[in-house]
Curated annotation (Swiss-Prot):
GO MF annotation terms: 4 iron, 4 sulfur cluster binding; electron transfer activity; metal ion binding
Record's protein name: Ion-translocating oxidoreductase complex subunit C
Gene name of the encoded protein: rnfC
PROSITE patterns reported in the protein's UniProt record: 4FE4S_FER_1 (PS00198), 4FE4S_FER_2 (PS51379)
Membership in a protein family: Belongs to the 4Fe4S bacterial-type ferredoxin family. RnfC subfamily.
Chain intervals with Polar residues compositional bias: 578-592
Bilayer disposition of the protein: Peripheral membrane protein
Organism: Actinobacillus succinogenes (strain ATCC 55618 / DSM 22257 / CCUG 43843 / 130Z)
Pfam families: Complex1_51K, Fer4_7, RnfC_N
Cofactor(s) demanded: [4Fe-4S] cluster
Domain 4Fe-4S ferredoxin-type: 369-398, 408-437
Lineage: Bacteria, Pseudomonadati, Pseudomonadota, Gammaproteobacteria, Pasteurellales
Amino acid sequence: MTDVLTRYNSGKLWDFDGGIHPPEMKSQSNSTPISTALLAEDYYVPVKQHAGNAGNLLVKEGDYVLKGQPLTLGDGLRVLPVHAPTSGTVVAIEPHIAAHPSGLSELAVHIHADGKDQWRPQNPTEDYFTHTPERLIEKIYRAGVAGLGGAVFPTGAKVDAALGKVKLLIINGAECEPYITCDDRLMRDYAAEIIEGVRILRYILRPEKVVIAIEDNKPEAVNALRTSLQGANDMDIRVIPTKYPSGAAKQLIYVLTGMEVPHGQRSSSIGVLMQNVGTAFAVKRAVINDEPLIERVVTLTGDKIPHKGNQWVRLGTPIDFILKHVGYQPDNRFPVFVGGPMMGLIVPDLRAPITKTANCLLAPDHFEYDPQATEQACIRCSACSDACPVHLMPQQMYWYARAEDHEKSNQYQLMDCIECGLCAYVCPSHIPLIQYFRQEKAKIWDIEAKARKSEEAKIRFEARQARLEREEQARKARSQRAAAARREELAANKGEDPVQAALARLKAKKAGEAPETGGSAQGAPHIKTIRTEKGQSVPDNSEITALRRARRLARQQTNGNSPVSSASNSDSATISADNTHSTPKTAQNQTAPDPKKAAVAVAIARAKAKKAAQTTTGETVTENVTEKTAQNPTAPDPKKAAVAAAIARAKAKKAAQATTGETATEKTAQNPTAPDPKKAAVAAAIARAKAKKAAMLAESEKK
């Protein structure tokens, strides 16, 4: 393939397909030098004025700012800062109406000017050759310089991405759209500064060739630039035929080199980089004068504007303020355009501010503006395809855009559309094709943005899963190493498992016995265990619990005041004596007394005490009644008869209780199971109450 420089050096100019020659209407505004617009009282500076994301705010409400002071700062070359257009106070930071047909609002910094227009401290650069290209790119970025030809792509990022790749640097001065003359007047009035800005770009990029391309309808601009070069041959000025849209990047590259930029790639892929003349001027001001991009040249034209021309307008100035000072009278019948008649946008609210994208304010009257005709059905005439300079098929893209068939729209290369407006200009059905294409692009971009977010989330999830897997593998590896270390320790200890030995010592400590530290686990005392519902092995504390209950019941019996207590004490003494006699055997067997047997013995003692108390009380009552009856052999007294009946019932009850007690005692002896301590305590209390009642009854009878 022929090299781009070879084709350029041939001196030939190529002609692209399509294109038109609309009425230029440039003479309305290019006859007078650029003037300076009046300072407004209030400025509304949008925080995002470029193709990219907005930066982070550096100011807040109530702050005083100086002219050129940064209001935002990004975290990369693609996030451009914005600057204060004049000195004043930040009144608010809130959404403000944007210069867009949608009429939507965007975040803006509202600055109330103090009228002093005082600059922040500046550090001009006298010799930029003493700085590295990277340092100059940083200065361009911090000045907020973006492409002023319409795309507003961050200049610093664009230049940085093309380092070492550029063979041909093209400075675009074609300005092909009707009515717009801001670049024409800039080249006439500031040719020397534009040349200096081009040389700065050449120093950074180091291309082999530099060319300034201008349409042949701007002879004054061509002469001004050639005069400023003063015979220097470090750059060329090449005049090209006037044809719309020869100022578009891909079309201008084809005109100069005959080469097309591949689909989906940038011009740097073929060794070409393009910048606008206004961008070159802004680069010079940023590097040499240390002035950020806070103003730009705006063309004020249209028959509704009496004082036409080009003005330096501060960014953030309300559009209605500018139009008011050039004699514009609002008229609802005719809209105001930001941009030219081919690619411009209608502004629904004139309070919207000027931004870096605004190169023209067009206010036509009834001689220049036709009311929008009624849209009709497409007749498949192919006029749009014939006029398209990018070799697209607008009629097909129109159908797919209306059907929201995004896949087909991409297949027909909708994203290659430069939105020049030619298809809508030549359409006999008056179909606003560019509006359909812009809406379809926005939908596709939104879908792609969501897909990117989803993919990023997927990548984060997979990275997290991989991290968790690595951690799990590391944990398993640590466990395996620990197990291997335990096996080695077990082998070193001659078969004694250190874990089992530690568990044995812990169990021995809980049982109140000192573990043998130096011995093996087999030498530790045997500890009874039971199984829980979950299958875990825990120590069996039932014997200790029964022993504690027996001791508590014994203390309760000892502290009692009834005869039962005395009997219980005597029986307890008997049991203690028996236990004392059995002590040698216990010592011989080296076994502690069985708590279950102790509990059974206590229960038997309580039963015997209860029986003795009932027997004694019954005999005393019987003897007293018999004696009184023998001494007084008279007719039976009803009271005595009742007493006798009660005595009989008491004897019968006593006999029954004695029989039940003996049976229970025998069963208890046969089945050595510890009685329920609560029931035993209740029974003992009832027995004491009955014995006390019987004793009181016997005393009353004696009296």
